[in-house]
């Protein structure tokens, strides 16, 4: 997928002033909007001469000597600065600071693109900060983050931030139709879903999981299934803990909104119109789940069964169907 296929990114790209580009750029927004595609296109513009076929081929093959792409699930300190006796299977001893300290090989510039920059700990971020405070000439660092305010404020102060635009349901649905998808639309997914994630869910046969989750909640709250059965079913989903927590938060937010605004639920949620609950209790549950999600990013060893045992117990005590 390229920039021309993602109109919301193309608009952001066209507004970038490459004649006055700072050394650091942060691309921020939820997963599934194509932030890496935008970052890659910025890097291409900085490195590739369109009249130089060799440079174009090297970049397309991800072998351009003046481009370092850190695409790791978690960015470690050794990826940012040299650590003796620490070896990376893919990068070896290559790291951001050493890479940027060398003069360009075939281009005027050197560019580092870091995906999942929000996973860096404070030590890694402080190591990176040195390259932002005293940047080498013609060097550029592009950071991709899925979470706002996940980096040190000193990093934000030395970078420009490109925030991805929020898309309306109509914009997402129109894009899906342009990709040949008309059987599904945003109403079949959580409200926070992004277009590329919808596409991936459909291609990976995961597009019915959220609907199934809501049906599970109905069975559980109406005493048609006990918590052990629900937990077993949840464990069969090929999604991570954070996604399951997001599903639960989405479900509770829909019930809460309906209650506060006195709106009648329809479709998948119509059976919850008669649900009885305290808005304060459900609000507190949502806050607790949001805090749990934040804690998980710091301590990802949280036990999934313990988490859902606790919250299903709280749900049963809070919502009557």
Please identify what each model-predicted range represents:
Residues 1-59, 137-140, 146-321:
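Charged, glycine-rich active-site and insertion segments that engage polyanionic ligands
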Residues 1-123:
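Clamp-loader machinery-focused feature within the broader ASCE/P-loop NTPase space
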Residues 27, 114, 128-129, 145:
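Hydrophobic residues in beta-strands of the RecA-like P-loop NTPase core, especially within AAA+ ATPase
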Residues 98, 130, 157:
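Conserved adenine-binding aromatic site and its adjacent loop/helix in ATP-hydrolyzing domains
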Residues 101, 126-143:
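Conserved catalytic/switch belt of AAA+ P-loop NTPases
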Residues 102, 106, 134, 295-298:
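Membrane-interface junctions
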Residues 119-120, 134, 150:
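Residues immediately C-terminal
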């Amino acid at each position: 997928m390229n920039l021309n296929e993602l109109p919301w990114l193309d608009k952001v790209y066209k507004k970038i002033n490459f004649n006055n580009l700072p050394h650091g750029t942060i691309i921020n927004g939820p997963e599934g909007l194509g932030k890496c595609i935008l970052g890659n296109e910025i890097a291409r513009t900085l490195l590739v001469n369109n009249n130089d076929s060799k440079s174009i081929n090297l970049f397309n093959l991800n072998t351009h000597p003046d481009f370092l792409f850190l695409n790791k699930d978690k960015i470690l300190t050794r990826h940012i600065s040299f650590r003796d006796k620490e070896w990376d299977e893919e990068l070896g001893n290559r790291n951001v600071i050493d890479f940027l300290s060398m003069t360009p090989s075939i281009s005027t510039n050197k560019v580092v693109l870091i995906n999942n920059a929000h996973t860096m700990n404070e030590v890694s971020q402080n190591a990176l900060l040195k390259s932002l405070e005293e940047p080498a000439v013609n060097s550029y660092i592009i950071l991709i983050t899925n979470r706002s305010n996940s980096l040190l404020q000193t990093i934000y102060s030395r970078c420009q931030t490109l925030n991805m635009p929020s898309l309306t349901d109509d914009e997402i649905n129109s894009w899906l139709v342009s990709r040949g998808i008309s059987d599904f639309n945003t109403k079949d997914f959580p409200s926070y879903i992004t277009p590329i994630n919808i596409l991936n869910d459909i291609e990976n046969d995961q597009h019915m999981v959220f609907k199934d989750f809501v049906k599970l909640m109905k069975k559980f709250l109406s005493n048609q299934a006990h918590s052990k059965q629900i937990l077993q079913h949840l464990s069969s989903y090929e999604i991570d803990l954070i996604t399951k927590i997001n599903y639960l938060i989405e479900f509770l937010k829909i019930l809460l909104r309906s209650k506060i605004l006195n709106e009648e639920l329809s479709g998948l949620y119509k059976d919850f119109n008669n649900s009885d609950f305290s808005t304060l209790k459900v609000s507190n549950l949502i806050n607790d789940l949001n805090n749990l999600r934040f804690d998980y990013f710091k301590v990802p060893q949280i036990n999934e069964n313990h988490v859902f045992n606790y919250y299903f117990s709280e749900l049963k005590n809070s919502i009557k169907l």
